[in-house]
Amino acid sequence: MKTLLLTLAAATIVCLDLGYTLKCNKLIPIASKTCPAGMNLCYKMFMMSDLTIPVKRGCIDVCPKNSLLVKYVCCNTDRCN
């Protein structure tokens, strides 16, 4: 019985996410990745010439400022990009 309880406890610890980790979409939205520590935002980058198709997605620590050529959209929830 003790072995069963220890096994269940170990499985629970392994399955739990003990620290919050953000998941962001990669370039293809069906694929996501877990962001490393310190990267607490997801982003999409668009070329200003075509705001309908993102050219890059991923994790980032600070949302960059938009420029004349590039627009960034940042968010902070799982797979929000």
From Swiss-Prot:
Query: Quick one: signal sequence residues?
Result: 1-21
> InterPro entries from the xrefs?
Cytotoxin_Cobra (IPR003572), Snake_3FTx (IPR003571), Snake_toxin-like_sf (IPR045860), Snake_toxin_con_site (IPR018354), Toxin_cobra-type (IPR054131)
Q: Keywords on this record? A: Cardiotoxin, Cytolysis, Disulfide bond, Membrane, Secreted, Signal, Target cell membrane, Target membrane, Toxin
Q: One Pfam family of this protein, by short name?
A: Toxin_cobra-type
Q: Which GO terms describe its cellular component?
A: extracellular region; membrane; other organism cell membrane
| Tissue-specific expression | Expressed by the venom gland.
Q: List the disulfide bonds.
A: 24-42, 35-59, 63-74, 75-80
> Per the annotation, which location comes first and is thus the protein's main one?
secreted
Q: Where in the cell is it found?
A: Secreted; Target cell membrane
The keyword Signal appears for this protein? yes
Q: Subunit info? A: Monomer in solution; Homodimer and oligomer in the presence of negatively charged lipids forming a pore with a size ranging between 20 and 30 Angstroms.
Role: Shows cytolytic activity on many different cells by forming pore in lipid membranes. In vivo, increases heart rate or kills the animal by cardiac arrest. In addition, it binds to heparin with high affinity, interacts with Kv channel-interacting protein 1 (KCNIP1) in a calcium-independent manner, and binds to integrin alpha-V/beta-3 (ITGAV/ITGB3) with moderate affinity.
Per its record, how is this protein called by name? Cytotoxin I-like P-15
Mind giving the lineage of the organism this protein is from?
Answer: Eukaryota, Metazoa, Chordata, Craniata, Vertebrata
